[in-house]
């Protein structure tokens, strides 16, 4: 959600800023801008719309400089206008900001009384004026920033430069990701490593409360008490190829097709261990797992659906009660606390604000044991978790999550079996059987991917529809939810999902010839129940699109379309059936001509409430 990039070097940094912002587009945005300090003067360009349009304007105006900052904005305070786009300027102070300032109205009134005139509706402009105010009181840029952040309530990542101090820029972090890149005689700042990968692989992750001074010849970092501190230097393993399309038309398509490989990468430790040892989740996991009596999962969006799937596995395989809750709901209610329950948070980015705050809330309530499942090392949620298990999905650029979701499912399945083995609910034979199912999973997923031409053929049937209904039962109900979410996210077709058994309790009223109904119908113990639900749809003139197993014994007829995946894959069937609903959403969006990788109004990393 929003993106920051900044650079100071002995070369022209404008190409670095533009390329960095392009690599941050996946986070979601509606406007962008850069500002540079050139020959003692500030030059700025801002545009609504795509970064490419802003970049053309910067080129036409001949931007070139050795110091600059840039930003992609996802509107929160104020509409999508050029005046509200970043960077903001106040009397030679230039600033970009991610986050939300909660007390901006109070500060705005205060600054207006001092004579400051506001040009935008944003909370960000308040910070620029505030920093200038403290500089007027005799402070330098860094000191003014440190004074300003003490006056702010909320979350932020900031990069600031001043016309009065052309040899450096400064930054600050509280609640929003921000990292520093170290180059050879040049330094950078960004909200995401992908923005800097073309310039450096050496990065330092700032912590909450940190401020920093960024110079060509080095950096200085200060903690919340303004004391100098050292933060660890990391070497990023993100590759440029993982951030490029290659042979694919969209990142979403690429990431769907990467799933056999990333699933194999994620399960590699279990395969190497020939089982599901607790150490997959950290050195202290065994002692923690032995003492727990239940699981509480907290997540948002697609990660929440992964948690819903995990509940079936954890209760059936490990014999432990499992609750799953949307993080943004959990954090605002008086929740039940059992110190012997393990709190599991799931987040692709590791920075999802509601999930992060829900975890902090759970710990404050008295939950002692926490596990983070995340795709981003050194992000905020893992840093405050007792146990960590990283998915190995690699960078996910498409806003609609695909490979991050299925790798989360693999980790959650491993958790269920590890708990089952430790509790004696799974014997050696059962563990070996689960391991074999896991080993076969990448091949099964590849077979599902081979169905893409057939699924693309269905997309024409959906492209002119305004609504769709997804049905599933048991383990596959969360996959129906995920399918509906994917369709609405990228094709803008209103879609809902229900347990198939709930049809007659309301959703059946929606069914008619104009309502396509997608059914996930594996050959499991609930298949006959699902077939009965399908008959209810057919009796009302509904058109059925069924994803079935090879041996589910469906025959196509008018109003009944069937794509067979493969023979039933047991408890891992939800992962295999995820692939067809991803492909259906993708190809429907293609036919409708929407922006697949950057759907309107959405952001990849949701770092505000």
From Swiss-Prot:
The places in or outside the cell where this protein is found are: Cytoplasm
Query: Record's superkingdom?
Result: Bacteria
Name any GO cellular component annotation: cytosol
Q: Note one Pfam family from the annotation.
A: SIS
For this chain, one GO molecular function annotation is: glutamine-fructose-6-phosphate transaminase (isomerizing) activity
Q: Which residues form the active site?
A: 2, 604
List the catalysed reactions: D-fructose 6-phosphate + L-glutamine = D-glucosamine 6-phosphate + L-glutamate
Family annotation (InterPro entries): GATase_2_dom, GFAT, GFAT_N, GlmS/AgaS_SIS, GlmS/FrlB_SIS, Ntn_hydrolases_N, SIS_dom, SIS_dom_sf
Segments forming domain Glutamine amidotransferase type-2: 2-217
Enzyme Commission (EC) number: 2.6.1.16
Write down the CDD domains for this protein, in alphabetical order: GFAT, SIS_GlmS_GlmD_1, SIS_GlmS_GlmD_2
The SIS domain covers which part of the protein?
285-425, 458-599
Where is this protein primarily located? Answer: cytoplasm
One Gene Ontology term from the biological process aspect of the record:
UDP-N-acetylglucosamine metabolic process
Indicate the quaternary assembly. Homodimer.
Function summary? Catalyzes the first step in hexosamine metabolism, converting fructose-6P into glucosamine-6P using glutamine as a nitrogen source.
* HAMAP family referenced in this protein's UniProt entry, alphabetically: GlmS
Q: What is this protein called?
A: Glutamine--fructose-6-phosphate aminotransferase [isomerizing]
Q: What organism does this protein naturally occur in? A: Xylella fastidiosa (strain Temecula1 / ATCC 700964)
Which lineage ranks, top first, belong to the organism behind this chain?
Bacteria, Pseudomonadati, Pseudomonadota, Gammaproteobacteria, Lysobacterales
């Amino acid at each position: 959600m929003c993106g920051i990039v900044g650079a100071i070097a002995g070369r022209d940094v404008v190409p670095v800023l533009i390329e960095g912002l392009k690599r941050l587009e996946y986070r979601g945005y509606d406007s962008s801008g850069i500002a540079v300090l050139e020959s003692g003067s500030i030059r700025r360009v801002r545009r609504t719309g795509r970064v490419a349009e802003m970049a053309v304007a910067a080129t036409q105006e001949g931007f070139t400089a050795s110091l600059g900052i840039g930003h992609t904005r996802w509107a929160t305070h104020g509409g999508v206008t050029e005046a509200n786009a970043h960077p903001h300027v106040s009397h030679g102070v230039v600033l970009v900001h991610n986050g939300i300032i909660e007390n901006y109205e109070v500060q705005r009134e205060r600054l207006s009384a001092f004579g400051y005139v506001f040009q935008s509706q944003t909370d960000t402009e308040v910070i620029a004026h505030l920093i200038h105010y403290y500089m007027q009181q005799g402070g330098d840029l860094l000191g003014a920033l440190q004074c300003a952040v003490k006056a702010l309530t909320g979350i932020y990542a900031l990069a600031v430069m001043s016309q009065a101090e052309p040899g450096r820029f400064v930054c600050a972090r509280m609640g929003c990701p921000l990292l520093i890149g170290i180059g050879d005689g040049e330094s950078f700042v960004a909200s995401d490593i992908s923005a800097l990968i073309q310039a450096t692989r050496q990065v330092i992750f700032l912590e909450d409360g940190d401020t920093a001074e960024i110079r060509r010849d080095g950096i200085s970092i200060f903690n919340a008490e303004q004391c100098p501190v050292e933060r660890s230097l990391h070497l990023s393993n993100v590759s440029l190829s993982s951030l490029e399309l290659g042979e694919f038309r969209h990142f979403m398509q690429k990431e769907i097709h990467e799933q056999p490989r990333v699933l194999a990468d994620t399960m590699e430790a279990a395969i190497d261990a020939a089982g599901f040892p607790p150490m997959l989740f950290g050195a202290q996991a065994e002692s923690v797992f032995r003492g727990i009596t239940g699981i509480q999962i907290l997540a948002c969006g697609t990660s929440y659906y992964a948690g819903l799937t995990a509940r079936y596995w954890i209760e059936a395989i490990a014999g432990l009660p499992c609750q799953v809750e949307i993080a943004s709901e959990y954090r605002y209610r008086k929740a039940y606390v059992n110190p012997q329950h393990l709190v599991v948070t799931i987040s692709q980015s590791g920075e999802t604000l509601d999930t992060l705050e829900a975890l902090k809330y759970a710990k404050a309530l008295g939950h002692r044991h926490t596990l983070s499942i995340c795709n981003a090392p050194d992000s905020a949620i893992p840093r405050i978790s007792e146990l960590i298990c990283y998915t190995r999905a690699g960078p996910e650029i498409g806003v609609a999550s695909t490979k991050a979701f299925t790798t989360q499912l693999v980790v959650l399945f491993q958790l269920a079996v590890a708990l089952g083995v430790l509790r004696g609910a799974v014997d050696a034979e059962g563990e070996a059987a689960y391991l074999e199912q896991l080993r076969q999973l990448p091949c099964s997923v590849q077979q599902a991917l081979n169905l893409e031409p057939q699924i693309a053929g269905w997309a024409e049937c959906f492209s002119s529809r305004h609504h769709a209904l997804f049905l599933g039962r048991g383990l596959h109900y969360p996959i129906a939810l995920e399918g509906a979410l994917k369709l609405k996210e990228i094709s803008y077709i209103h879609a809902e999902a229900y347990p198939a058994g709930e049809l007659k309790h309301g959703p059946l009223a929606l069914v008619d010839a104009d309502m396509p109904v997608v059914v996930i119908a594996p050959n499991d113990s609930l298949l006959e129940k699902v077939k009965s639900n399908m008959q209810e749809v057919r009796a009302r003139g509904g058109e059925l699109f069924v994803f079935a197993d090879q041996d589910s014994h469906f025959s196509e007829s008018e109003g009944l379309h069937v794509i067979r995946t493969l023979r039933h894959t047991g408890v891992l069937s939800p992962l295999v059936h995820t692939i067809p609903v991803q492909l259906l959403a993708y190809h429907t969006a293609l036919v409708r001509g929407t922006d697949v990788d950057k759907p309107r109004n959405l952001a990849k990393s949701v770092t505000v409430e």
